[in-house]
């Protein structure tokens, strides 16, 4: 039975792809190849730099998300792990808390910072 499905599934998929190609309408014109941005055509550069705070939050999300997936096996088998498993979990969580407190003390999570270019004082000196 499995071999029938193994041979039948690719055949059905190919038949559906060929039918889609034969039956579908293909209206290709220049507007389909152009950029679409919120319903209007952009006439200037619309790319702006990402906020550093956004990237910082995204990067800091990864270790704490991995922390949750690392805790899950302990939660599932908490009764069979005993004291040894609990001590390993506490050491793991303690190391993450220490790292988080260190980041706070460094000011890495201060999202109110604004980027000030280094060139600005130089430009003031050149124009004055």
Curated annotation (Swiss-Prot):
Task: Give the way it sits in the membrane.
Answer: Multi-pass membrane protein
The alphabetized UniProt keywords are:
Electron transport, Membrane, Mitochondrion, NAD, Respiratory chain, Translocase, Transmembrane, Transmembrane helix, Transport, Ubiquinone
Q: Which reaction does it catalyse?
A: a ubiquinone + NADH + 5 H(+)(in) = a ubiquinol + NAD(+) + 4 H(+)(out)
Query: Which domain of life, per UniProt?
Result: Eukaryota
- Record's GO cellular component, any one? mitochondrial membrane
For this chain, the annotated S-S bridges are none
Which EC number(s) are documented for this chain? 7.1.1.2
Gene Ontology MF term list = NADH dehydrogenase (ubiquinone) activity
The protein's location, in the record's own words, is:
Mitochondrion membrane
- Entry's transmembrane regions: 3-23, 52-72, 84-104
The protein's job, in short, is: Core subunit of the mitochondrial membrane respiratory chain NADH dehydrogenase (Complex I) that is believed to belong to the minimal assembly required for catalysis. Complex I functions in the transfer of electrons from NADH to the respiratory chain. The immediate electron acceptor for the enzyme is believed to be ubiquinone.
The Swiss-Prot or TrEMBL record describes its family as follows: Belongs to the complex I subunit 3 family.
Name this polypeptide is given: NADH-ubiquinone oxidoreductase chain 3
Species the sequence originates in: Debaryomyces hansenii (strain ATCC 36239 / CBS 767 / BCRC 21394 / JCM 1990 / NBRC 0083 / IGC 2968)
Gene this chain is encoded by: ND3
């Amino acid at each position: 039975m499995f071999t029938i499905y193994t041979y039948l599934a690719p055949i059905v998929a190919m038949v559906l792809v060929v039918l889609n190609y034969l039956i579908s309408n293909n209206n290709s014109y220049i507007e389909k190849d152009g950029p679409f941005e919120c319903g209007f055509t952009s006439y200037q550069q619309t790319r702006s730099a990402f906020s550093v705070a956004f990237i910082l939050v995204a990067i800091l999300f990864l270790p704490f998300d991995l922390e949750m997936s690392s805790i899950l096996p302990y939660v599932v088998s908490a009764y069979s792990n005993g004291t040894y498993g609990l001590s390993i979990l506490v050491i793991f969580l303690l190391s993450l808390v220490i790292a988080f407190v260190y980041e706070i003390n460094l000011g890495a999570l201060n999202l109110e910072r604004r980027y000030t270019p280094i060139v600005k004082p130089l430009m003031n000196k050149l124009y004055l």
